[in-house]
Amino acid sequence: MYERAMLSKNFDHAANEQRIYAGWEHGGAFAANPASSATPFTIMIPPPNVTGSLHMGHALTFTLQDSLVRWRRMQGRDVLWQPGTDHAGIATQMVVERLLASEGSPGRREIGRDAFLDRVWRWKAESGGNITHQLRRLGASLDWGRERFTMDEGLSAAVRDVFVTLYRQGLIYRDRRLVNWDPQLQTAISDLEVESREVRGNLWHIRYPLEDGEGSIIVATTRPETMLGDSAVAVHPEDERYTALIGKCVILPLTGRRIPIVADTYSDPEKGTGAVKITPAHDFNDFAVGRRHDLPMPSIMDREGRITLAEITCTEATDIADPAFVTGLEGQERFAARKAIVARLEEMGFLETIETHTHHVPHGDRSGVPIEPLLTTQWFCNAAELAKPAVAAVESGDTRFVPKQWENTFFAWLRDIQPWCISRQLWWGHRIPAWYAPDGSVYVAATAEEAQAAYGGSETLTQDEDVLDTWFSSALWPFSTLGWPEDDSILSRYYPTDVLITGFDIIFFWVARMMMMGLHIQKQVPFRDVYIHGLVRDERGQKMSKSKGNVIDPLALIEAHGADPMRFAICLLAGPGRDIKLGPKRVEDASRFVTKLWNASVFCERNGVKPEPGFDPATVTLPLSRWILASADDAIRAATQALEAYRFDDYAATCYRFVWNTFCDWFVELAKPILLATDTPEAAEIKAVAAHVLGVVLRLLHPAMPYVTETLWDHFGYGPEFSLIRAPWPEVGVSDPAREAARQEIDWLVRLIGEVRTVRNEMNVPPSTLTPILLKDAVAETVARAERWRDQIARLARASSVTSLEGALPKGSAQAVLDEAILVIPLEGVIDLDAERTRLTRERDKARDEAAKVVRKLENADFVARAKPEVVEENRDRLAALEADIARLGAALERL
């Protein structure tokens, strides 16, 4: 214990947090112990990007994880919370490319691959630790000695091993398929790196003449430039308008190519004209149609998003075909080509109408440009085959989703999963372990030497230029970080992991793929539970975005209030299956809770409360002592059950109620008169009980509020410095009849004082005014209780007397029910009863009027359908608050 004269007036988070964290870290408090006989508890950090900075999503995920691991550590489990960062292929490459540009240095392609990668590694060494420093500020008790990076040599070896294994099993292969192509970054990107943006554009209706000259068919498209690569027109097989045309052909304007009219259910008769142009090489749905009908798939765009004509043909010039115009499109940027094509179609009479049209266009989330579905040769993984055991594991209960509803999302994605494009046209990342011979043959091996040996020729093989999708290495995270494939000793102890805590947005991209790889490579699920949390929104329920100006910086909150209030606010709001509405006010409220705990501790210290070695709670005799011990047991039981069920909100609410209401508001207040008589046995018992319960409080709160609790634990001398983190989780004591009787008696006292305070508050009785309390219809035991606690009732309920009432109620009395008795508080002459009735009636009527307006709004189906979800939710919350006010005001009127 470090020495302090007395606790200061307030907890100074700035002076204590980093000091305490360093004490924990240097003392090995976070470290797992593989040699321990304790049951392991393993949880994997979702590795943040090495380029990242702490945002509220991180704060949510890591607060919940840290609360869980601190609790399990206190339960005596051998906790491994595995830290690390992701190499973040595109993000990191862009950061370093921008850095080179800002320095005026030559670009990536000018300096070459090796020099560029050296520069990335230097940047990582200099700046890549930013996010891990910020996680320390949050209080995350990660086992930093085991920190991993997805491009560490050990993890890279695991990546190569898995790639080679899957390739040899036929589960990784090369294919020419459509991918999301970013023309600016010039790489394939994952669906997670694509964001849909609403764009106000046009829907062009274009006339395609029938080959037999007997009319034409009209198609509608938002992308007329892709018509150069059309292979068919699709109509629904049951659309009577086009039944007679199925099997016939149209002549494609501009190129003059002959393309068929095919029947396919992809075409929606209710949408547009019901006829759809099919461009298999530039649309994912069209690609599927093309494969079903064995259509040609000419690509008309290069990797920079420019028109290329290498794969298409034109007929001679006719009134339909204009080969000279088409030839002139070669090399044009796609949107410039669009304008030219629309203009030429209009000149030739094929543009039927132009309709203003708002639609969603996929954009690269980093480049900001519209992505292009592009037919390219890439490496793919047979995700459908790998998904089958993952689906079965969830169906059987080997892996459990919490909340359970997320299982449906998991199943929906995995039962309709497409081949996973795992190659990226980048330099930063795990280079694909495939080598090519001069004749184009492919040799997949863990090393160049193995590939060369397999080839057997004298020519030097050339390694594939591409790197793997970042999610490929992330999918191996639960076992690659534990030493596989080189050393299985740690893996056998800590795998499978116990729980994964993450957001719903990466169930498919990360959770599902970890399950695929874990089951296929390790033959075990990677985690037993998957806890899915929602998004962090602002206090109005709106999604945070820079454009709205409502982004909350967690580090700014930590600087202003400390990590504890932010962490506690997050836990308090983290209910299952719902988003978190977090604003500065929530953190300020939690900061007041920290202050409440601190003030109670100051009170205890000033009244001589300190840990009593050998104190046995079973020996106490005072009803107040027995009551607070029973209440502490209730809190321990409820907090433990909540954490076991991942109900972080219930855990935090339990702690809040017990500390603020039970311990501070009632125990401390009821203990004050006893503590004034400093040398009595009663005072000694209350001090010992207070010290014991404060120790329980600090341990209960530690998972969510580690800094203030460790500070107080150290200060009071409950254990050596920095020892709360490994102190045992409190256990429920043995119940006995005396403790239960004390619980009933003090609970009765608390309810009586609470009812009187409510009446006085509702009736606007001045705090300085004492009022008598009359007990009508009270049984003998109630009267005896009132007598035993007369002084406390008088002090805390502002009562001039507490007596039984026989006969009629005094005129102008307020009433409240307490068990079998009626509490009567005479108010004649204390307040203006008529004025009070008028005030209460006026406030109730106003609340009713406001509630009626909100009800009308919520009953308006058009409002509910059109308004933003957060606005509808605000109105529902407002209605609930108004209904509570109406009930409260009605009850107050009934009291009169």
Swiss-Prot record:
CDD domains: Anticodon_Ia_Val, ValRS_core. A motif ('HIGH' region) lies at residues 48-58. ATP binds at residue 546. GO terms for biological process: valyl-tRNA aminoacylation. Keywords: Aminoacyl-tRNA synthetase, ATP-binding, Coiled coil, Cytoplasm, Ligase, Nucleotide-binding, Protein biosynthesis. It catalyses: tRNA(Val) + L-valine + ATP = L-valyl-tRNA(Val) + AMP + diphosphate. NCBIfam families: PRK05729.1, valS. This is Valine--tRNA ligase. It comes from Granulibacter bethesdensis (strain ATCC BAA-1260 / CGDNIH1). The lineage of its organism: Bacteria, Pseudomonadati, Pseudomonadota, Alphaproteobacteria, Acetobacterales.
